[in-house]
Amino acid sequence: MANLTKLKIVTPYAQNLEKDVYSVELKTSEGRIAVLPDHNPLMSIIENHVAYIRELPNAPRKPLLLLDGIVYVEEHQVRVFSDYFKFLDEIKIDEINSLLNKLKNDLANEEDDKKKLQLKSKIKLNESILIAYKDR
């Protein structure tokens, strides 16, 4: 059996992913990195991008959209604290664009300041998803 690393991803939206993987490819503020088993410890800021995980050495890479966050690499563990993540095959760009248009329309018609802030936050999240999606 191949030597594997535990990947843990956590977001403020209570999204969690925990699985054993062979490699994780990430885009940090310093450039792209690939984390393999027994990688030296490191901590870095990650940017909005499409990351890739490989479950086994010869397995195909699986694309995963990650938004801003921090990665901590330890001997047998990669921990990612990200604003948002989703596997690329689960993302429906048409639905995101439709939702974005609806949110912008709702914002233009909203008078309550608290609801405006919530709408702006959702708009920013969806715009970030679209930008990161183009990174693939």
Curated annotation (Swiss-Prot):
Keyword Ion transport part of the UniProt annotation: yes
Keywords, ordered alphabetically: ATP synthesis, Cell membrane, CF(1), Hydrogen ion transport, Ion transport, Membrane, Transport
UniProt xrefs under CDD domains: F1-ATPase_delta
Gene Ontology MF term list: ATP binding; proton-transporting ATP synthase activity, rotational mechanism
A Pfam family reported for this protein in Swiss-Prot or TrEMBL: ATP-synt_DE_N
InterPro entries (UniProt xref): ATP_synth_F1_dsu/esu, ATP_synth_F1_dsu/esu_N, ATPsynth_dsu/esu_N
Gene Ontology, cellular component aspect: plasma membrane; proton-transporting ATP synthase complex
Membrane topology: Peripheral membrane protein
Cellular compartments annotated: Cell membrane
Family: Belongs to the ATPase epsilon chain family.
HAMAP family assigned to the protein according to its UniProt record, in alphabetical order: ATP_synth_epsil_bac (MF_00530)
Subunit structure: F-type ATPases have 2 components, CF(1) - the catalytic core - and CF(0) - the membrane proton channel. CF(1) has five subunits: alpha(3), beta(3), gamma(1), delta(1), epsilon(1). CF(0) has three main subunits: a, b and c.
Function: Produces ATP from ADP in the presence of a proton gradient across the membrane.
Protein name: ATP synthase epsilon chain
Organism: Ureaplasma urealyticum serovar 10 (strain ATCC 33699 / Western)
Gene behind the chain: atpC
